């Protein structure tokens, strides 16, 4: 077949410029230079790109039709790529034409020679023609795609071509092509050519498969684009889409180098323009696939876009907003009418309808418009052009009526869509049968409008004429009147009936003619013309009837209170979450956490457990706080349910072996636990109080009047203060006398005050005063303790003042009122006044404040609940209670005193606040104290008294059972001591405390000293005289006497700090005076006056009255000096007297004359210590003036002397006020606090941090003022007993040595003495020891470790251990002696205080330093209570501790270390056991 018959351009020849270019892209036709490759190619609108030197040309091919004709009806000639643009450029930017034509992807190429043979030329054309075959041909014959080329290669045509190439020499061979040697004209006959051919064949096959995939992809895209334009399968729409697709012009891009003038004019018909190519050189037009090869128009290739598509198919009307863009004017005028104009009709918006029938309307009907309303014009701001819009309000501006939109040039990508829209606009609008226009198809479709001005295109046919729409004038309508709400007419059933409205039922019968009626009738609140009063019928019921019924039928007595759970809408604050924790109290000291956990584990899962311990000693407080996490696994409920169940079940149960019954309460937030710990610590470490009264003083019985006077109940006694001192009780006494109106409990001291806040002076005026810059003592400042009437107390820790001091109002009172309150009220007649006048609480003495604070039943936390004095005073005071114990309580208390007196041994007192004094608790107390074998358990309104048969049991009971619980009550044990019954001849003067008052009389003093003038002896007589005594507080000092007759106080002396133990009682020498000896007034109703006058103030005056047989003796008893005091208890015996005054008591002058007055006449010096080296005590007498009169038998020969008149002397307080030191009541208030604190023995806390310095001989003495500046020094163990509370038992003095070893050395070397006894003990093991050891394994003894008074910690017995019983085993690590020596040195370097090495024999040492039990804490004593033995058990040595004597609960276990004696004094260790038989040294 000729080349021209196959579509090959005849101009292409072997000498032509067309070069062979194999395919290089994914498509088969990409990169081909021959125009014939485009013939019959079904590739759609694909682009073939060819790179030129400076520009890129894109070609578009029509999708439909095998051949394309030009406007003349002929096929265009193929286009030469080299005609105007030059040789083509390969993908590597190298020219393909003149020199070489490369294959795609560098697979090889041939040189372009003009000297090819005809066979070579025809072969090249054949290959090119096969390469540009249509894609369908490639698909159909993909197997033998290049079969003809293979046959040509077999025939040797390629060899001929290669030989023809060889004539011109070697030029530009590609990669992998045949190479020839230089200078030769033939090709090498080797395997390289065959390999190159095979590789080319495989490349073509791969390219064909890629072309097939690309074709399927293009077909899929084409179908997708067709589906987008034809959503419905209607035949009309399908024909329209096929027409649009058939006449769509291909997309093309003209060359950038060609001008727009060269582009052909646009075609006016409906067919798309084709590319116009130039004719061939011979003038013949050759058909090409859309390309005209013309040298003139080669560079200017353009595309004509169709402007309109005039089809006869029916198209739905276009949207109104599209037509409005061309019909509405640009500058609309504002509307003039009130209502918006009616919208233009559809005739204006649409084209005249054509003769075609409209399509059937398948949309829902348009809703009708409201009455008297017209459709509004479309708004530009709205995206929906709905004709059924509501009327616009009057105030809003109306939208423009006519707007013109200039058209904007449309991009080529949207030309087809705009063409269809333009065609739709030009079509007439179909009409319905009735002549109305059909609504547009997108009436209910939301179409967004773009307010953009479209620039008109160059083509005039696309421009639509701009028309203005003139709206019709608005219709004149009359506005409707405003709407008024009509009155509400309720339904007939809700109409109000006449009458009050109270309806009830009566039993009236109304008979009608037929004799039928109703027994009940409803009446509108009226009966007989009167209003019926409605009453509750339950009020007429009896109590029995109201109590009948069950459940809801039972009559309710009151309204039920409804409760609701708290939520976010509740007005009350959110309550705390339900408690999930419990507080356990009353635990034994040996109860462990494991026991508590085991006890509570069955109730629920425990989340947290906190056992409270003593912060000072580390001992258990018996308080435990347990928090639950929830119920046990598998059980329903919450943690609160578990805690509630634990409280119900566990309260009152026993946990440990001690038998203590615990108390369990809910404590979700731990507040109760904190309060319980605080109270327990305060109970264990109470603030120090002044010591007890002297033991030689007796309690004076009350008279009948005093018994009738009521008193207030006492407070809880302090644990460290015994309630019963060594006192004797008179059998004839009904109750002890305290002072008028107050009953003193058994042995309670009256001078105690409650704890007070720290006293800190921050006032600048106080800082400027010299007497306030140091702690108060006997001689400091301008006001001394003796001048203010205070006794000297030993050093005490800082306590807190009562809160009443801080709550005093500062009210200024008249001067005379203040003087009367602060003075001794000289000259006041007390005859018509009350005998129990309230004293000011601010009094500087032991006034009503101290007595109230000690015996008030109110707590310190509830001061506002305490009764107050009705009169206002400038300083705090407390009012005495008007009630007291009943007569039965007093009688029972007297029986208790009698039982204690008969027992004669110390007893244990339990306050009623700790355990109620009820008879049902007696059996529980007997079980609680049965181990100590109490002789009797009695109780009164004050509490319980447990009596024992010896003097030591009470102390052991206090040490062991203190803070234990009985029936959920924590016991507070206090030991009371009693000296037992005494003869009545030895009875002393009654001792009273507090402040008493008399109805008349002034102050008088009687000072009894060692220096008194001789006086005649007073004989015993049967006559009696009445003595009235009145004792006032020294704080309200001042009298009619002169300055020289002011009572002589004790001499000033500095108070040394006290380092006594808080747990042990003070020695007899350390006990301070309980009361100061006060002034005493005695009026003896006798004729005449007599006085016992000594030197200066030593006066005993007796004033005679006017009665014929009455004498008055005034005795002014002053405070006795410290070394010269005479106990007033030796005045005489108090008995009941007979006479006119039943309340009087008779004081026999036998003791008065023999012991007191006789020594005044002799002038003998009294001993410095009254009893057993005891310091002289100060005593204050307090008795009712009218109720406690005494009769003294005196001799009538005594001549009394009239006393001298004394001038009024100002008191110290008056001097302070006059001097200006106290400016106002506030200064006096703070001074009162200072003096009250000093009275209690409190040390003030100064703001500058000053403190008292100890003596130079004290171990803690330092000169620099700071311990850090003193350096480190070692304090001997003996010296620690002087200031450590737990070391007060070490009383044995030892000589000072240079090097004193510690307990570590003692224990290290202490087991050497067992060398000799170890072997003997191991060989001579008795069966009793083995039996005791086996018994220990069965039941261990209850032991407890705590701070020891000897050294460090000690081991105490918690149960009775009889002699010979095994106590415990000394457990430790058994090592050789050499290893023990190494460990000893290691312990010394580590600073371990004790090594606890116990030598068993010469080779084995038991080391309990890190591996041991509590047995290693047993201390040494020269008087041991146990001993250590080494026994053999199954061939193994055991160290066992046995009791030598009976060990009682609370007693420390001690044994003798038996160290060998040391000759070197530096190695000797002092002994601190404090026993009576102490040797002084351990070795």
Curated annotation (Swiss-Prot):
Gene3D superfamilies listed in its UniProt record: 3.30.70.330, SET domain (2.170.270.10)
Catalytic activity: L-lysyl(4)-[histone H3] + 3 S-adenosyl-L-methionine = N(6),N(6),N(6)-trimethyl-L-lysyl(4)-[histone H3] + 3 S-adenosyl-L-homocysteine + 3 H(+); N(6)-methyl-L-lysyl(4)-[histone H3] + S-adenosyl-L-methionine = N(6),N(6)-dimethyl-L-lysyl(4)-[histone H3] + S-adenosyl-L-homocysteine + H(+); N(6),N(6)-dimethyl-L-lysyl(4)-[histone H3] + S-adenosyl-L-methionine = N(6),N(6),N(6)-trimethyl-L-lysyl(4)-[histone H3] + S-adenosyl-L-homocysteine + H(+)
Compositional bias segments (type: Polar residues): 291-300, 455-464, 977-987
Record field: compositional bias (Basic residues): 1020-1031, 1163-1178
Basic and acidic residues bias: start-end ranges: 64-74, 100-117, 127-138, 148-165, 172-222, 816-836, 1068-1082
Disulfide bond sites: none
GO molecular function: histone H3K4 methyltransferase activity; histone H3K4 trimethyltransferase activity; RNA binding
Record region (Disordered): 1-478, 677-699, 805-838, 858-891, 977-998, 1013-1082, 1163-1182
Key words of the record: Chromatin regulator, Chromosome, Methyltransferase, Nucleus, S-adenosyl-L-methionine, Transferase
Record field: compositional bias (Low complexity): 250-262, 371-382, 411-427
Enzyme Commission (EC) number: 2.1.1.354
Record text on subunit structure and interactions: Component of the Set1C/COMPASS complex.
Role this protein plays: Catalytic component of the COMPASS (Set1C) complex that specifically mono-, di- and trimethylates histone H3 to form H3K4me1/2/3. Binds RNAs which might negatively affect its histone methyltransferase activity. COMPASS recognizes ubiquitinated H2B on one face of the nucleosome which stimulates the methylation of H3 on the opposing face.
PANTHER family: HISTONE-LYSINE N-METHYLTRANSFERASE SETD1
Name listed for the protein in its UniProt record: Histone-lysine N-methyltransferase, H3 lysine-4 specific
């Amino acid at each position: 077949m000729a080349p021209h018959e196959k579509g090959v351009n005849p101009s292409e020849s072997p000498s032509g410029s067309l070069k062979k270019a194999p395919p290089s892209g994914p498509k088969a036709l990409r990169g081909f230079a021959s125009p014939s490759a485009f013939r019959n190619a079904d590739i759609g609108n694909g682009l073939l790109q060819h790179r030129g030197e400076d520009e890129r040309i894109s070609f578009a091919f029509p999708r439909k039709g095998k051949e394309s004709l030009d406007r003349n009806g002929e096929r265009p000639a193929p286009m030469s790529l080299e005609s105007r643009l030059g040789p083509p450029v390969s993908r590597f930017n190298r020219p393909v034409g003149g020199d070489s034509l490369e294959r795609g992807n560098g697979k090889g190429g041939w040189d372009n020679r003009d000297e090819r043979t005809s066979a070579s030329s025809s072969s090249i054309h054949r290959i090119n023609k096969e390469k540009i075959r249509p894609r369908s041909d490639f698909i159909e014959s993909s197997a033998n795609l290049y079969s003809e080329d293979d046959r040509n290669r077999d025939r040797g045509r390629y060899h001929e071509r290669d030989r023809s190439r060889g004539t011109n020499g070697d030029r530009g061979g590609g990669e992998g092509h045949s190479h020839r040697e230089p200078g030769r004209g033939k090709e090498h006959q080797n395997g390289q050519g065959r390999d190159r051919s095979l590789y080319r064949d495989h490349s073509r096959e791969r390219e064909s498969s890629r072309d097939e995939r690309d074709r399927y992809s293009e077909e899929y895209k084409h179908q997708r684009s067709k589906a987008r334009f034809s959503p419905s399968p209607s035949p009309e729409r399908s024909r329209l889409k096929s027409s649009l697709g058939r006449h769509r012009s291909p997309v093309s891009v003209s060359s950038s180098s060609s001008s727009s003038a060269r582009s052909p004019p646009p075609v006016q018909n409906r067919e798309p323009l084709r590319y116009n190519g130039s004719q061939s050189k011979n003038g013949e037009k050759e058909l090409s696939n859309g390309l005209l090869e013309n040298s003139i128009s080669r560079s200017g290739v353009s595309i004509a876009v169709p402007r309109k598509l005039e089809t006869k198919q029916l198209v739905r009307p276009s949207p109104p907003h599209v037509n409005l863009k061309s019909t509405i004017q640009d500058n609309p005028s504002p509307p003039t009418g009130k209502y918006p104009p009616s919208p233009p009709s559809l005739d204006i918006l649409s084209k005249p309808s054509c003769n075609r029938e409209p399509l059937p309307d398948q949309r829902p009907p348009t809703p009708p418009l409201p009455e008297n309303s017209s459709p509004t014009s479309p708004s530009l701001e709205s995206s929906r052009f709905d004709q059924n819009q509501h009327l616009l309000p009057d105030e809003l501006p109306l939208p423009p009526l006519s707007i013109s939109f200039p058209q904007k040039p449309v991009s080529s990508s949207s030309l087809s869509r705009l063409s269809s829209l333009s065609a739709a606009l030009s079509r007439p609008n179909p009409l319905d049968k009735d002549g109305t226009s059909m609504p547009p198809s997108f009436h209910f479709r939301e179409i967004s409008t773009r307010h953009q001005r479209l620039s008109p295109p160059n083509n005039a046919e696309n421009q639509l004429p701009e028309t203005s729409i003139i709206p019709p004038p608005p219709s004149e309508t009359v506005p409707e009147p405003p709407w008024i709400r009509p009155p509400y007419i309720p339904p007939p059933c809700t109409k109000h009936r006449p009458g009050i409205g109270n309806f009830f039922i009566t039993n009236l019968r109304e008979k009608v003619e037929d004799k039928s009626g109703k027994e009940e009738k409803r009446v509108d609140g009226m009966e007989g013309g009167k209003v019926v009063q409605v009453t509750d019928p339950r009020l007429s019921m009896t109590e029995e009837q109201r109590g009948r019924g069950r459940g809801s039928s039972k009559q309710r007595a009151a309204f039920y209170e409804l409760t609701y759970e708290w939520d976010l809408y509740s007005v009350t604050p959110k309550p705390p979450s339900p408690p999930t924790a419990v507080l356990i109290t009353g635990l034994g000291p040996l109860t462990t956490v494991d026991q508590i956990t085991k006890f509570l584990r069955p109730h629920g899962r425990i989340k947290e457990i906190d056992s409270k311990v003593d912060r000072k000693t580390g001992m258990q407080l018996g308080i435990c706080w347990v928090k639950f996490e929830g119920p046990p696994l598998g059980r329903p409920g919450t943690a609160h349910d578990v805690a509630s169940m634990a409280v119900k079940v566990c309260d009152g149960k026993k946990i440990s072996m001690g038998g203590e019954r615990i108390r369990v309460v809910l404590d979700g937030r731990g507040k109760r636990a904190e309060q319980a710990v605080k109270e327990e610590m305060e109970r264990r470490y109470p603030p120090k109080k002044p010591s007890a009264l002297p033991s030689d003083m007796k309690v004076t019985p009350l008279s009948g009047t005093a018994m009738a006077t009521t008193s207030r109940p006492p407070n809880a006694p302090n644990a460290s203060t015994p309630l019963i001192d060594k006192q004797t009780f008179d059998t004839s006494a009904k109750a002890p006398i305290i002072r008028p109106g107050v009953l003193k409990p058994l042995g309670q001291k009256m001078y105690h005050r409650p704890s007070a806040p720290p006293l800190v002076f921050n006032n600048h005026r106080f800082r400027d005063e010299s007497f306030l810059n140091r702690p108060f003592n006997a001689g400091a400042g301008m006001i001394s303790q003796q001048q203010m009437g205070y006794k000297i107390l030993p050093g005490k820790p800082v306590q807190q003042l009562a809160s009443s001091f801080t709550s005093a109002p500062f009210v200024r009172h008249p001067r005379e009122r203040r003087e009367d309150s602060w003075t001794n009220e000289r000259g006041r007649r007390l005859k018509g006044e009350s005998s129990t006048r309230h004293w000011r609480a601010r009094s500087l003495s032991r006034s009503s404040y101290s007595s109230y604070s000690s015996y008030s039943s109110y707590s310190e936390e509830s001061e506002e609940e305490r009764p107050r004095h009705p009169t206002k005073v400038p300083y705090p005071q407390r009012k005495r209670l008007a009630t007291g114990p009943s007569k039965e309580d007093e009688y029972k208390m007297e029986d208790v005193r009698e039982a204690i007196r008969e027992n004669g041994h110390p007893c244990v007192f339990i306050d009623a606040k700790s355990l109620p004094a009820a008879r049902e608790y007696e059996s529980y107390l007997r079980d609680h104290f049965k181990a100590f074998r109490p002789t009797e358990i009695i109780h009164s309104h004050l509490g319980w008294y447990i009596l024992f048969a010896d003097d030591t049991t009470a102390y052991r009971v206090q040490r062991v059972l203190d803070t234990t619980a009985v029936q959920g009550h924590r016991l507070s044990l206090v030991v009371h001591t009693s000296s037992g019954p005494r003869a009545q001849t030895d009875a002393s003067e009654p001792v009273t405390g507090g402040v008493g008052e008399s109805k008349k009389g002034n102050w008088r003093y009687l000072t009894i000293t060692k220096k008194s003038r001789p006086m005649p002896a007073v004989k015993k007589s049967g006559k009696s005289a009445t003595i009235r005594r009145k004792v006032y507080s020294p704080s309200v000092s001042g009298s009619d006497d002169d300055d020289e007759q002011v009572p002589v106080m004790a001499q000033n002396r500095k108070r040394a700090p006290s380092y006594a133990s808080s747990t042990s009682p003070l020695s007899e020498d350390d006990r301070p005076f309980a009361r100061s000896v006060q002034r005493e007034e005695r009026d003896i109703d006798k004729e005449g006056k007599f006085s016992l006058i000594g030197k200066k103030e030593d006066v005993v005056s007796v004033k005679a009255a006017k009665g014929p047989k009455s004498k008055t003796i005034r005795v002014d008893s002053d405070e006795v000096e410290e070394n010269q005091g005479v106990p007033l208890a030796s005045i005489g015996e108090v008995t009941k007297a007979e006479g006119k005054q039943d309340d009087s008591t008779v004081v026999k002058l036998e003791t008065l004359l023999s012991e007191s007055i006789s020594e005044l006449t002799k002038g003998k010096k009294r001993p410095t210590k009254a009893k057993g080296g005891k310091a002289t005590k100060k005593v204050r007498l307090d008795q009712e003036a009218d109720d406690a009169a005494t009769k003294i038998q005196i001799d009538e020969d005594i001549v009394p002397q009239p006393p001298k008149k004394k001038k009024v002397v100002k008191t110290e307080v008056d001097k302070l006020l006059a001097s200006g030191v106290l400016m106002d009541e506030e200064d006096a208030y703070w001074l009162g606090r200072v003096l009250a604190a000093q009275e209690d023995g409190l040390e003030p806390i100064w703001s500058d941090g000053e403190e008292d310095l100890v003596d130079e001989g004290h171990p803690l003495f330092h000169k620099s003022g700071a311990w850090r500046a003193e350096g480190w020094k070692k304090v001997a163990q003996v010296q620690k007993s002087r200031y450590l509370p737990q070391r007060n038992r070490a009383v044995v003095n030892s000589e000072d040595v240079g090097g004193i070893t510690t307990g570590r050395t003692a224990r290290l070397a202490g087991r050497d003495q067992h060398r000799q006894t170890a072997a003997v003990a191991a060989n001579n093991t008795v069966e009793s020891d083995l039996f005791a050891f086996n018994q220990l394994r069965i039941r261990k003894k209850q032991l407890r470790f705590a701070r020891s008074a000897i050294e460090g910690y000690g081991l105490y017995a918690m149960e009775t251990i009889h002699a010979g019983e095994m106590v415990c085993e000394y457990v430790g690590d058994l090592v050789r002696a050499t290893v023990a020596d190494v460990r000893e040195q290691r312990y010394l370097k580590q600073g371990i205080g004790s090594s606890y090495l116990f030598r068993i024999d010469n080779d084995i040492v038991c080391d309990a330093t890190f591996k041991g039990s509590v047995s290693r804490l047993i201390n040494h004593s020269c008087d041991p209570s146990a001993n250590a033995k080494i026994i053999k058990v199954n061939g193994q040595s055991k160290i066992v501790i046995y009791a030598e004597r009976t060990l009682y609960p609370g007693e420390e276990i001690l044994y003798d270390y038996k160290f060998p004696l040391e000759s070197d004094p530096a190695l000797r260790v002092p002994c601190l056991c404090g026993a009576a038989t102490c040797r002084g040294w351990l070795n």
